[in-house]
Each structure stands twice: as C-alpha cells, then as structure tokens.
C-alpha cells in the first residue's frame, strides 16, 4: 500500500506540469512541512545522534573498502596533477599571484581546524566542510570555490581518494609547491555523506558569542570564540584591537584544539607566511548569501560578490585586506621579520575592518599586488598577529623562530602535521608511504606485538584461572568496561589497547573506582606474570578484556544460556613514556550511564550524556539499550551503587532489568530525599522495591526506547538478550582494534 501511494504521488507530479515555474515564486509547501517531535516537545530526549551516518546514506555501498582503494592510488601522479591545478588560474575565480597554494592551505586548515580536544569532534575526517553548517560559516567564505577548483581531480580519481583526504593532501602539496618541506601525509579519512550532528554553540546568529560566562570563561566543549569562526576573531576579541586580549583568546582556543604555545606560534607564523586577506569593499553591501541560503541557480556557490569584477582584485572574504610578506607564494621568514622589524599602527581595510600597517608609511612598496603587476602595497598584520609580538610567552618563541629558521621550519611542519592528522587516531589507521618514521606522543602510541599470541587452549585456561581468582563478576565487568569504554569514535582515541587504565590519569578517575580498580589490576597482573613465565604470553590489555569476557560467560551460564564471548588477542601495554597525561585527561567520562555514573559539573542532563556516550562508542539504539540493561543485571554500576539494579539476581546476565522496568505492578515516583533519584513502589502495598536514575527510567518513558525495551522484556527474549549483549559488548571491546579491522 505504501509503494502504491508513492506511485500515485509521482503520477500527480507528472500531470501537474513542470515545477520550474513554481520555484521562481515563494517556496511552495512551506506551510505543509512536517514539524518535528523535537519542536513540540523540546525537552524530549533526542536520539538522532545514534541514527546518523548509517550505511544506507553511503552511495558507495556497505561493501566499499576505502583503505583498499586508496592503497591502489598513484599518489605521486596525483600530487603532480594537484600542482598543475594550483598553477592554472581559472577565469571564474582567478588565483592570487597566479597560484592557488595559499587558498588551498586555508581550505585544508579550516577543514582540520574545527577539531576540539574536549569531545574529539570536528577535524578533517569525514570531509564535513562540504556540508552545512561548516560549508556556510562566515569563516569559510569562498572555500566553496577552493573545493570546486579541485573537482576535476576528484572526478578523475573518484572513490580512490575521499574529499576528506584530498583536502588535506592538497594543503600539503600547496606547501611543498611553495618551497616548504612537510612532515608527512597519511591517508585513510573516509567521507561522510551527511552533516554531523555537533553542538557548535548556543548562538542563533553567526558571529555572536553567548558561549562565555563570568570573566570571559569559554564553556565546554567549545573552542572557537564566536559562532561561525574556526578559531578567533582576527580583529581582536569582538573586534577590540587589543593584541594582549587577543593573545588570551588565541591561547584558550588553540589550547582547546590540542596546540601548545610553541605549536600555536608556529602555525600562525607559518600559515600567514603565505597568501593574503581579501576585503576590497564592505561585505554588508556587496556580498550575497552563503551557499546554504543562495539560490538553486548558484549550484552550491555562495557569497556572490557584486563589487566591480566580483573576484580577483575585487574579492571580498573576511573584510581584511592585504598580504603579510613580499613573497606570498614562497616559504620564508619574512612574516617574523616584518612582525618584529616594523612598528605597527592601526588602520582600516577598504571594507572597514581593523588591521595594522607599518608606521609612517614604511614598507609602502614592499608587497606586490595579487593581480596587477603595476601596483605595490605595504604589508599588513591582524590584531591576532601582533599578539605574537606583545604576549611575553609568544614573543620569546617567535623571536627564537626568527633567529633559527630551521627550527621554525620543523616546528611548523610538525604542527601542521598534527593539525591535519589529530583526529585520525592511532597509527594503525594511517595509510600511505609518506608517513613520519617515528611515532609522536599525541598519536597515543602503543608497543608493537613482540610475543606469540595465546591460542584457544590457553585462552580457556586463563579464563578458568580468572574465575577462580576471587574476583567477582561485577568487578571483572567493571574493569573491562572502564578500559574499553574510554574510546571516542570522534577522534579514535582511548580504548582497551595499551592498558592505560593502569596508568595515570585513568587509574585515578572517580568513575573507575580507583580503590577497587587497583585491587583487580593487582590480581590480574599476578595471573599475567605467572602465565608469562612459560610458552606464549599475554598482555595486561588483553587479559583485562578476557577477564570481562570470562565474567560475562559465567553470568550467562547462571542465566541458563551458554555463550562464548569472542576474543581477539593482540593488544599491548603502553608505557608511561608513551602517555601524555594531560592529553589523556580529556578522555575522562564525566558521565557514564552504562555504569550509572553522573559526575559533577556536567552541562548536559544524565539522559543526554547517555546518548552522547553511546554516540562516542558508535552504538545503535538497540546496542545502547541491551548494553545498559545487561550492565544493570551484571551489577556493574560505578561505586557499587544499587540504583537501577532491577533484579533479585545481581551478577546474572538476565533480562530482569527490562522485565521489572516495564512491570505495571511497580509505580515510580521521584525521591523526596535525593534529586535525580526515583523510587519504584509496589502499587498495592506501597513498599519500596527499587531505586533508579533517569538513565534507567528513560527506557520506559521514552516511547522509542520503550519499544526496544519491550523486545528484550518479552518472554521469548532470554537467549536473544544474551546474544545481543555479547555482540554489543564485543563491539565495544574491539573499537580501537584497527589492526584487525
């Protein structure tokens, strides 16, 4: 019936005639558009993050293997073709100085620069710059043209290189074509096919900044200073031309994007060695709508400029105008020489933006015009550039770079590599022949496997020893979960490999029950040490996961279901020298609904944090549901809390959580003593049966989650529940095993 209805609608469209005429008027059907449930009930828990990026949206199909395609690519030939594009100016968007290199550097930088360490979101992976909102952010103005310039390359190579990889590679090639030696390039970034659901800030208009509280304290997880900017306002905080105030914004923003002071100075000084800013006239008078709001006839282009030619020397982008150096398409130290060699005074660009030029007209004929060889200009600086001169810490670094060009070159090369690869995860995800020879600490390296892996008989023997160790099922499950569930699919960090749960800072996180964790790890280390005395060896990272698996098999057995939890050895144990404590501190789960933990200082509600954590773990709605219910039955709450343990048989892998949650003989009410806690009362006697939190009750309250919970609460679901739990559990344990995927 549904297909027949679609066919009828299609026929009606055919007989009603061409739709072009209607498109020239007001958009038809606006009053008939569906209004989402979120509109009617804005407080309703939004499950959309768990439904994004499904395989159904990928036109390349479920079986497409990007890594295999990329490995067949002739990367050197591709790079030469990119260089040809770079030096072939197009009439529809002429190249500054006859070279698109600086333009492509900005494209690559802005593709990667959205990354933020707090939640790992943003970054170059997925090629999200192609989609809204990033495609239409003010800070990305005219980058639609940069990608369109690359379309002939993408068209030729098709599925062999993703847009995500192509944008970063093009940035590298741009640097190399202008005389700079890059630190390397890794492919492996797959393309997304829809816009990512990311919280970019509370603002409702571009360039607003309601993201601050108190004394300009930027709220987590945000990093940029204003809605629609990648980093900071180049004119200074909210347009205030104060270099020292700008330095504070720079340090905060770049720090939240994983860069220290030295990397920050290197990136700004290195990046502004190339190219120019564009602001030949007032954008409010001459620049049209961004791509998302432009007309169909623009075919994805935005920011149409009606000032004179509309491009070339009349281009309007940021509103700032000019170049920093006399050789904007060559790698030099001129940026630093100019920064410290001139005294800078405030002026305004032709568009009215605040910028800086040398005092008393110095350097007036230093910089060639980007399009008219008969014209010369003075160099310019942004307020944010002068921050490198006036901030004490930045100044020391910038002067050192000026005096030591080779050190500056290496620092920029490494910072650029970090910027463009920060969200790629471990080295096992890197593809290509141009990789750095030595691992970098921000890549969270782990040792290579240097021992023979355990086989089936040894695995069974180890499981027996674990179950006889005196450690309980909940203890083993909690420890394995704590080790693996630190993983973030957003930037592929964390996970069980490396056994960093035994190292600082992870061993001290409150959610991990440090006292209990220490005892469990000590016992497992004893088992490991004894086993490793002869024959094959096992890492602690592997043993932690195996211990959790053994506990689940035992718990399922007690429930009357025989099951074998998959186990793939090959993890190794990282050292403290391979672990950046500060870098790992951002992985700390401030809330973990699967362990019924909700720490202080969270900006989202417990149920929102449930969805966020499930999204980080790449879980579907059914996987999230069965995992939480199973963890409750296994008595795996943090701190041994009994909230949500809706079973009289804790430690048994049963579907009791769902059965008792949906039991109509229980009436739920808010606790009068504890905020956020609920009590389940016997409807007849009023006696208290259970206590639970919002992340427990949401599976009975939310209509879509209840529908899934009903499946697992059914009488015929006992075996399905166990098998689905095991499948989801194994998925979490294997999230960081890119070496076997």
Curated annotation (Swiss-Prot):
<keyword id="KW-0732">Signal</keyword>
<feature type="cross-link" description="Tryptophyl-tyrosyl-methioninium (Trp-Tyr) (with M-257)">
    <location>
        <begin position="109"/>
        <end position="231"/>
    </location>
</feature>
<feature type="active site" description="Proton acceptor">
    <location>
        <position position="110"/>
    </location>
</feature>
<keyword id="KW-0575">Peroxidase</keyword>
<feature type="signal peptide">
    <location>
        <begin position="1"/>
        <end position="21"/>
    </location>
</feature>
<feature type="site" description="Transition state stabilizer">
    <location>
        <position position="106"/>
    </location>
</feature>
<keyword id="KW-0376">Hydrogen peroxide</keyword>
<keyword id="KW-0349">Heme</keyword>
<dbReference type="GO" id="GO:0020037">
    <property type="term" value="F:heme binding"/>
</dbReference>
<keyword id="KW-0408">Iron</keyword>
<dbReference type="GO" id="GO:0005829">
    <property type="term" value="C:cytosol"/>
</dbReference>
<dbReference type="GO" id="GO:0070301">
    <property type="term" value="P:cellular response to hydrogen peroxide"/>
</dbReference>
<dbReference type="InterPro" id="IPR010255">
    <property type="entry name" value="Haem_peroxidase_sf"/>
</dbReference>
<keyword id="KW-0479">Metal-binding</keyword>
<dbReference type="GO" id="GO:0042744">
    <property type="term" value="P:hydrogen peroxide catabolic process"/>
</dbReference>
<dbReference type="GO" id="GO:0004096">
    <property type="term" value="F:catalase activity"/>
</dbReference>
<comment type="subunit">
    <text>Homodimer or homotetramer.</text>
</comment>
<dbReference type="InterPro" id="IPR000763">
    <property type="entry name" value="Catalase_peroxidase"/>
</dbReference>
<keyword id="KW-0560">Oxidoreductase</keyword>
<dbReference type="GO" id="GO:0046872">
    <property type="term" value="F:metal ion binding"/>
</dbReference>
<dbReference type="Pfam" id="PF00141">
    <property type="entry name" value="peroxidase"/>
</dbReference>
<dbReference type="InterPro" id="IPR002016">
    <property type="entry name" value="Haem_peroxidase"/>
</dbReference>
<protein>
    <recommendedName>
        <fullName>Catalase-peroxidase</fullName>
        <ecNumber>1.11.1.21</ecNumber>
    </recommendedName>
</protein>
<dbReference type="InterPro" id="IPR019794">
    <property type="entry name" value="Peroxidases_AS"/>
</dbReference>
<feature type="binding site" description="axial binding residue">
    <location>
        <position position="272"/>
    </location>
    <ligand>
        <name>heme b</name>
    </ligand>
</feature>
<comment type="function">
    <text>Bifunctional enzyme with both catalase and broad-spectrum peroxidase activity.</text>
</comment>
<comment type="similarity">
    <text>Belongs to the peroxidase family. Peroxidase/catalase subfamily.</text>
</comment>
<feature type="cross-link" description="Tryptophyl-tyrosyl-methioninium (Tyr-Met) (with W-109)">
    <location>
        <begin position="231"/>
        <end position="257"/>
    </location>
</feature>
<dbReference type="InterPro" id="IPR019793">
    <property type="entry name" value="Peroxidases_heam-ligand_BS"/>
</dbReference>
């Amino acid at each position: 019936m549904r297909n027949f209805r679609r066919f009828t609608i299609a026929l009606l469209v055919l007989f009603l005639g061409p739709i072009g005429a209607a498109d020239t008027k007001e958009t038809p059907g606006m009053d008939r558009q569906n209004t989402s449930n979120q509109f009617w009930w804005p407080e309703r828990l939004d499950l959309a993050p768990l439904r994004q990026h499904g395989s159904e949206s990928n036109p390349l199909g479920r079986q497409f293997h990007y890594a295999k395609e990329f490995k067949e690519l002739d990367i050197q030939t591709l790079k030469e073709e990119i260089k040809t594009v770079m030096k072939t100016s197009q009439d529809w968007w002429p190249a500054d100085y006859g070279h698109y290199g600086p333009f492509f550097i900005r494209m690559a930088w802005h593709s990667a620069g959205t990354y933020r360490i707090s939640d790992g979101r943003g970054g170059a992976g997925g090629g999200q710059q192609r989609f809204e909102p990033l495609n239409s952010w003010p800070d990305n103005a005219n980058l639609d043209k940069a990608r369109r310039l690359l379309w002939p390359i993408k068209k030729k190579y098709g599925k062999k290189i993703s847009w995500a990889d192509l944008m970063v590679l093009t940035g590298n090639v741009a640097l190399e074509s202008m005389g700079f030696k890059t630190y390397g390039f890794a492919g492996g970034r797959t393309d997304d096919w829809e816009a990512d659901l990311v919280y970019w800030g509370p603002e409702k208009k571009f360039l607003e900044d309601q993201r601050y509280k108190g004394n300009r304290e930027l709220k987590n997880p945000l990093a940029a200073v204003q809605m629609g900017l990648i980093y900071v306002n180049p004119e200074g905080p909210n347009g205030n031309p104060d270099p020292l105030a700008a330095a504070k914004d720079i340090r905060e923003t770049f720090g939240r994007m994983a860069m220290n002071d030295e990397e920050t100075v290197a990136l700004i000084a290195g990046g502004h060695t190339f190219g120019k800013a564009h602001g030949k006239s007032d954008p409010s008078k001459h620049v049209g709508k961004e791509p998302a709001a432009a007309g169909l006839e623009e075919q994805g282009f935005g920011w149409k400029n009606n000032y004179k030619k509309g491009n070339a020397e009349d281009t309007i982008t940021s509103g700032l105008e000019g170049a920093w150096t006399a050789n904007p398409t060559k790698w030099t130290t001129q940026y630093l020489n100019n920064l410290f060699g001139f005294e800078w005074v405030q002026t305004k660009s032709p568009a009215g933006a605040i910028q800086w030029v040398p005092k008393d007209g110095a350097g007036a004929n230093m910089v060639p015009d980007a399009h008219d060889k008969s014209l010369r200009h003075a160099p310019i600086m942004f307020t944010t550039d002068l921050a490198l001169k006036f901030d004490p810490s930045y100044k020391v670094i910038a002067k050192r770079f000026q005096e030591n060009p080779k050190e500056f070159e290496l620092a920029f090369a490494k910072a650029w590599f970090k910027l463009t690869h920060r969200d790629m995860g471990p080295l096992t995800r890197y593809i290509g022949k141009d990789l750095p020879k030595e691992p970098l600490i921000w890549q969270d390296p782990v040792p290579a496997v240097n021992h023979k892996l355990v086989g089936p008989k040894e695995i069974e023997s180890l499981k027996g020893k674990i179950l006889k160790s005196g450690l309980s099922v909940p203890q083993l499950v909690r420890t394995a979960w704590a080790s693996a569930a630190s993983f973030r699919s957003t930037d592929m960090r964390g996970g069980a490999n490396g056994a960093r749960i035994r190292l600082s800072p992870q061993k001290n996180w409150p959610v991990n029950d440090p006292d209990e964790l220490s005892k469990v790890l000590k016992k497992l280390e004893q088992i490991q040490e004894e086993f490793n005395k002869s024959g094959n060896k096992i890492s602690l990272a592997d043993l932690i996961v195996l211990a959790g698996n053994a506990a689940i098999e035992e718990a399922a057995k007690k429930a009357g279901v025989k099951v074998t939890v998959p186990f793939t050895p090959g993890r190794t144990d990282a050292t403290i020298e391979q672990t950046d404590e500060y870098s790992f501190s951002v992985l700390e789960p401030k809330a973990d609904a699967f362990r019924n933990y909700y720490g202080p200082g969270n900006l989202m509600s417990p149920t929102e944090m449930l969805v966020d954590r499930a999204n980080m773990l790449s879980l579907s709605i059914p996987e999230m549901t069965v995992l939480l219910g199973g963890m409750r039955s296994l008595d795996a709450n943090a701190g041994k809390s009994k909230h949500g343990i809706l079973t009289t048989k804790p430690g048994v892998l049963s579907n009791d959580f769902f059965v008792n949650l949906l039991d109509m003989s229980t009436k739920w009410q808010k606790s009068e003593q504890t905020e956020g806690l609920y009590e389940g009362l016997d409807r007849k006697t009023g006696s208290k049966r259970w206590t639970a939190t919002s992340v427990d009750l949401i599976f009975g309250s939310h209509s879509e989650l209840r529908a899934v919970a009903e499946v697992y609460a059914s009488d015929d679901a006992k075996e399905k529940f166990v098998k689905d739990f095991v499948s989801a559990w194994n998925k979490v344990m294997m999230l960081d095993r890119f070496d076997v995927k």
